[in-house]
């Protein structure tokens, strides 16, 4: 065997654990779920499974509960995504200052992301927010009472539950802040100085220089936030369980109920692939729009 052949064999050997894991836990289940989406597979009675073709997908088009869950999810995304993008950018601008102890503040802002990412962390965070939203002795209503405002029902209100869960999503704002911060620290100082010498004020420098130069970071955060928002599950499952009155029945929660409450795995698989198609379509639209507002260094604006 030649030296190149041995090197290739060693490379495949090191690659094989990942490849086997990918086939067993990602590609394999995806193929199985795609096949199941064309059947009426029932978990409790797998022997009665029959091929229904596109029946599950046609059923989804006429499902009013699915339409409701999609509206709830899109409303949540419309609130949570802009809030994370704006607050993350504001925090990054503040924490980009050259001041003593700033590294400690940056760590403090990012720490909630690490907690939520730990094993069971997202459930623990959801339980913490359940206390924060508690109408009688929760933190939010206590803060409102300090400024003379009436208490709110928060997640126990059909009107406020989705905005409350969007507020809860800001627990992870440290992730977008960190990406913005990395982009801000790579800004060419000569361009900023040139804008200042030309008489541009702070707002004009931010809008005309800083924001275009960090637009790739904004684009990256937008794509991630959109995908995460469409797949929101833990908050609604732990905090509200879809209530009150299905007002927080997110798409993923409805999918979960079909799979593990009603045991209708065929229909649940179809819902999963429809969500994949929706996420892919929205992501493609964002990528298309990026041509007109994302600036890459060394290229014309929007390319």
Over which residues does each language-model region extend?
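Short, Lys/Arg-rich, polar N-terminal cytosolic tail immediately upstream
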Residues: 1-6
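A structural signal for multi-pass alpha-helical bundles of membrane permease subunits
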Residues: 7-303
